[in-house]
Amino acid sequence: LWSDIDMIIPVPLHWTRQWKRGYNQAEVIARAAAEALGVPVRTDILMRKRRTKTQIKLDIKEKAQNVAGAFAVTEDARAIFRNGGTVRHIVLLDDVFTTGSTLGACFRALRSVFPPTVRISVVTLGYVER
């Protein structure tokens, strides 16, 4: 899992939620992991393009619907390939895993730009059984 990592991408918050909270907990965790591993954190690759409801009280189907299409890759992600860059391994990081809806939506957005030859690993700090 930890070999050949090119970047760690934290699951982004919508800018209004991050502004209100003052930080993104996934980014805080990602920065600590990145420092330990000596790899960059890229907050410029994946964006939350619309606000979503908090997922805490939603059931599995509602969670999937809530985040469907909420994430997109940025122009910076597309530029990596246009400029001849190579990426072998991305770590997508979130603070907690419950149903996988958020991470799945992020994965699909990343896969729309990064080909199957790029490994995308998912890491979370915690798991909540529902």
Predicted regions span which residues?
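Conserved PRPP/pyrophosphate-binding segment of the phosphoribosyltransferase/PRPP-pathway fold
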Residues: 1-91, 99-130
